[in-house]
């Protein structure tokens, strides 16, 4: 883990943890272990599809259990749909929720800048 902190003196650092908090990143380490070590605010990215609410809430619960700060949940909209995942998540959590879609980059960037 110390290799991740070596010579980092930037004002903004982004570390991607693919697969979820409890996905392995090494033989005896999970993404959550890296997150705990680095103590950076989390941006939880969830694909906007059926099951997104459950995935987001479970990840938020795991972050809370491990005393990790979550800056926001990002719903990644690959395809237009009639789901109301953003509205549902806003109702279930106090964590900010933003959406990202191919055509809405400027709006997304302005929302994210306020949160991180």
Question: Model segments located where?
Answer:
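Anionic group-transfer/hydrolysis microenvironments
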Residues: 18-19, 49, 78
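Structural motif
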Residues: 14-16, 43-45, 74
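C-terminal lobe/tail of nucleotide-utilizing enzymes
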Residues: 61-116
């Amino acid at each position: 883990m110390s290799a991740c902190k070596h010579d980092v003196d930037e004002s903004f650092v982004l570390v991607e943890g693919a697969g979820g908090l409890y996905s392995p990143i090494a033989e005896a380490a999970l993404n959550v272990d890296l997150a705990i070590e680095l103590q950076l605010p989390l941006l939880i990215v969830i694909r906007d599809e059926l099951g997104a609410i459950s995935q987001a809430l479970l990840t938020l619960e795991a972050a809370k259990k491990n005393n990790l700060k979550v800056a926001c949940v990002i719903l990644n909209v690959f395809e237009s749909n009639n789901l109301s995942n953003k509205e549902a998540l806003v109702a279930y959590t106090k964590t900010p929720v933003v959406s990202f879609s191919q055509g809405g980059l400027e709006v997304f960037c302005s929302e994210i800048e306020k949160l991180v």
